[in-house]
Amino acid sequence: MARHFLSLHDYTKEELDRLLALAIELKQEQKQGGEHHLLKGKTLAMIFDKSSTRTRISFEVGIYQLGGHGLFISTGTSQMGRGEPLKDTARVLSRYCDGIMIRTFGQEIVDELAAYATVPVINGLTDLFHPCQIMADVMTVMEHKGGYAGLKFAWVGDGNNMANTWIEAAAIFGFDLALACPQGYEPDAKVMAWAAERAPGRVTLTADPKEAVSGAHVINTDVWASMGMEAEQKVREQAFGGFCLDDALAGLAHPDHIVLHCLPAHRGEEISDSVIEGSNSRVWDEAENRLHAQKAIMATLMGGE
């Protein structure tokens, strides 16, 4: 039976640590000019319900560097856009391809695809979770902090898919996470409850960004209005007043803190230009590490590494 990568909570800490170690190894090999055709001749179907820059490019380049081929599929120009049942698509793609990555809206779409696919399914993003991005983020922290143990992580902004997945990561890896979200924009209640049961006291939630950021070693933020929420932009701008990660807020963190943002960034809204361009920013390393983290996931699921 194929193993999927749908959310972090499907994996143990040890399994995720092995994926991170492989990602770091693959990155080092690439930097030294080495090749690792671990998926030679294999094809990854890449289904996109949402527009994409980093997800598409990092998966397409990644499968190529592993010796395979990425096949881009837009739901709008395929039979999925005309109502073909997802379970039929899953079965057919499983006959043609060796793995499926999907970037979509509802988590239930990814779950249904995985239920009927006989090849690995990778969650490239849903409205609930963004596991590939968090693996890249944790990898970035390991590179710049030597690990994640004993660090305080802070999240400032919307309780979106990134926040939900950081909550999972904190509970699984065992680090402290302080989230600051405006009232009414908190993370998913079920995810919070799961983390509270899995790792009591590791995850805290406040409406005060200063409280969350104080003493933090890692600060993370994201856009206030995710894709599909554009109509809420003006309302959210009002609700998120005081939640911009600017120099004053970042100054409350540990002096040697690092700043992460999954991109795209709306400078002057959730993060200031000076912070994202500042000496504590590791945003570009983070973006690069999407490539390496996803290569490790693909190599493990599709190649049995």
UniProtKB/Swiss-Prot annotation:
It is an enzyme of class 2 (transferase). Gene3D superfamilies: Aspartate/ornithine carbamoyltransferase. One of its GO terms (cellular component) is cytoplasm. Coiled coil: none annotated. The keyword Transferase applies. InterPro entries: Asp/Orn_carbamoyltranf_P-bd, Asp/Orn_carbamoylTrfase, Asp/Orn_carbamoylTrfase_sf, Asp_carbamoyltransf_Asp/Orn-bd, Orn/put_carbamltrans, OTCase_ArgI. The keyword Lipid metabolism does not apply. Its main location: cytoplasm. Carbamoyl phosphate binds at residues 52-55, 79, 103, 130-133, 262-263, 290. Its EC number is 2.1.3.3. Pathway: Amino-acid biosynthesis; L-arginine biosynthesis; L-arginine from L-ornithine and carbamoyl phosphate: step 1/3. L-ornithine binds at residues 161, 222, 226-227. One of its GO terms (molecular function) is amino acid binding. It catalyses: carbamoyl phosphate + L-ornithine = L-citrulline + phosphate + H(+). Keywords: Amino-acid biosynthesis, Arginine biosynthesis, Cytoplasm, Transferase. It is found in: Cytoplasm. Belongs to the aspartate/ornithine carbamoyltransferase superfamily. OTCase family. Reversibly catalyzes the transfer of the carbamoyl group from carbamoyl phosphate (CP) to the N(epsilon) atom of ornithine (ORN) to produce L-citrulline. PANTHER family: ORNITHINE CARBAMOYLTRANSFERASE, MITOCHONDRIAL (PTHR45753), ORNITHINE TRANSCARBAMYLASE, MITOCHONDRIAL (PTHR45753:SF3). NCBIfam families: orni_carb_tr, PRK00779.1. This is Ornithine carbamoyltransferase. It comes from Pelobacter propionicus (strain DSM 2379 / NBRC 103807 / OttBd1). The lineage of its organism: Bacteria, Pseudomonadati, Thermodesulfobacteriota, Desulfuromonadia, Desulfuromonadales. The gene is argF.
